[in-house]
Amino acid sequence: MKIWYQSYVDYENGKSYWDALRVHLDQSCASETTIDIRGITPFDSYAHPLVEFRCAREMICNAVQAEREGYDAVIVGHFQDAGLYEARAAVDIPVIALGEATMLYSCQLAQRLGIVTINPRFIPWFHHQINKYGLKDRVAGVHAMTFEPGQILEAYGSDKKAEEVRVLFEEQGKPLITAGIDALIPGGGIPMLLFSKFYNHTIETAPVINGIPIAVKMAEMAISLKRQTGQGVSRTSDYAKAPQEVIEEFLAHPKGL
């Protein structure tokens, strides 16, 4: 299996993160699976929907490129899943998203989930995302730390910064647990990977879910099932396949000119 892992960070600005991610992906996938990390430049450095929109467009183009280069699946390694539905409507290979995969799998581990994101400006986005996935009754709370995406990358080169992130995450997670949350999800691949060093990571018995290996395993499963059954996403509604000329137009006119 050959998988394209789409990070919303580029190597130039996230070298320590990419290096750690490379190791973690290799630990998470089957021995016969190859995962190639690809970035976005300029990277997602500021928490805002406009940045998500820009990065989503590039991700969709990259999903088309991945399919044309013979990849078996794409993983959107960005918890906000920006561009997910549009990418699925543009390609026939599986597109697995970090946020969706983590939330869906976590519903098998706990009845009530909580998310701790890195920045308060992401909270509205997450609520829209939760509603879109039909999980409003299961993901019952979203709290936030106070980092920009670019700032939290510094934790990969500083033990002091990493400890600061861990403490802030616990401070935001504990009130959710007190309110009845059964499991906590770090709202981003960057904090997920940062916390992956903690085996059976819990806060007051509530598991802290690392979604990166979940997304990898879901991608491998999607590839295997597609090979066995021939089935992919439904083309009747949200994922109706765009005509080829529309896809080519999208690729050729990034500014709509």
Regions picked out by a protein language model, each given a short descriptive name:
Residues 1-54, 121-159:
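N-terminal glycine-rich anion-binding loop in soluble enzyme alpha/beta folds
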Residues 208-228:
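Short, flexible loop segments at boundaries between secondary-structure elements
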Residues 84-96, 194-214:
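Short acidic, glycine/proline-enriched helix-loop-strand junctions
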Residues 16, 108-145, 222-257:
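Short, glycine-/small-residue-rich phosphate/pyrophosphate-handling segment
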Residues 49-65, 163-171:
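Glycine-rich, highly charged phosphate/nucleotide-binding loops
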Residues 132-189, 196:
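Active-site rim beta-loop-alpha module in soluble metabolic enzymes
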Residues 6, 68-78, 180-189:
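Periplasmic-binding protein-like
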Residues 60-109:
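Glycine/small-residue-rich loop that forms an oxyanion/phosphate-binding "nest" at active or ligand-binding sites
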